[in-house]
């Protein structure tokens, strides 16, 4: 991570940390870095979610892009993965999404995609940061015909919707409940599933600029659980603010998280011989039950650090086509370059239709172990050295010996906060409490500050 760019672009409280002035500079400098080798007039797609600050930041960002001669195609409100898809398929120099994903409405973010549809690598972000910190802006200042042209491009959303529909199968009146989080999916999810023939009940579809992710969406699926049961839906599909995540709800109102979604899709692809190297890429936070289910099916796994960017890096490096996170990021590389909640939803309903199985039947093949996560406040300098403290090492080893392979412990520093995270999984909640409490007592005694 750099000074401005975190693990998923530039984020902060809108108008205080992520200001219009910074958005202008990101447009100007980011656009220049990503298009400086173009032989023709560069084209950049810009999308946003429904936050009240979105249009303010979009106006500033677009002005910055236009100021270095870039033609800007405004996509309006649509999903983050739609920007990635359009960049890759329509030959743009880059794409920019204005969103803070699952964060509350007061936050916003700016995320860049390169011409290949992938998020920027560290080197490109470093180039942009160097220009942001330079004492003087020495970039070209074209005038007249050298300036960029602004084009409204609402048809981009229709193309994305049509593409997702083309990857699915007719649902023939299947009852589907949608929760679009009052966010980006509110402009597309209803249309996609209506075109597939589903009978719909939709919540979280009335954005007002302030209610994105507010008690709705993938981070708050409780309302959808009730709607699924009340409407008799076969499945509920909850997206986050920018629709790069999916959390599902089965016909009984039970949560089906990212681990289970990956397993269902992975097994389906494996049985068809379409799972690249018969491997799923996941992170260290995936549940032990998920790993055991993969082992039972003979499906391999590659494990990365937490964060969808690390999952994508491993997929690109090794040629895998399915990966994701427990939180609901699922990357289907055969279809798109980034996590796509609506794409995952289309594939999940397709599998239900083709197999004739309910979502609860498909998900029951993964027995999720009880999991507990505790965050302990520590000094930043100590969070990296925690595993070198003898008493902490000893208690972790002791707990792992007691587990005898039927559980898992993960102690890791937070990437963004002065926290040490202690997580355990075991067959019962009582065992999980025992393992986590025992370890956290030692950690607090040795290095904790709370």
From Swiss-Prot:
Return the broad EC class: isomerase
Q: Which residues cross the membrane?
A: none
> Residues in the active site?
101
Q: Which reaction does it catalyse?
A: alpha-D-glucosamine 1-phosphate = D-glucosamine 6-phosphate
InterPro entries linked to this entry: A-D-PHexomutase_a/b/a-I (IPR005844), A-D-PHexomutase_a/b/a-I/II/III (IPR016055), A-D-PHexomutase_a/b/a-II (IPR005845), A-D-PHexomutase_a/b/a-III (IPR005846), A-D-PHexomutase_C (IPR005843), A-D-PHexomutase_C_sf (IPR036900), A-D-PHexomutase_CS (IPR016066), Alpha-D-phosphohexomutase_SF (IPR005841)
What processes does the entry annotate via GO biological process terms?
Answer: carbohydrate metabolic process; peptidoglycan biosynthetic process; UDP-N-acetylglucosamine biosynthetic process
Q: Which residues carry this modification: Phosphoserine?
A: 101
The record's annotation in Pfam families points to: PGM_PMM_I, PGM_PMM_II, PGM_PMM_III, PGM_PMM_IV
Q: Name one GO cellular component term.
A: cytosol
User: For this protein, what post-translational modification is recorded in UniProt?
Assistant: Activated by phosphorylation.
Cofactors (names): Mg(2+)
| GO MF annotations, alphabetized | magnesium ion binding; phosphoglucosamine mutase activity; phosphomannomutase activity
Q: PROSITE patterns annotated for this entry?
A: PGM_PMM (PS00710)
Identify the EC number(s).
Answer: 5.4.2.10
Q: Which residues bind Mg(2+)?
A: 101, 240, 242, 244
The entry's family comment says: Belongs to the phosphohexose mutase family.
Q: What is this protein called?
A: Phosphoglucosamine mutase
Biological source species: Streptococcus pneumoniae (strain 70585)
Q: Which gene encodes it?
A: glmM
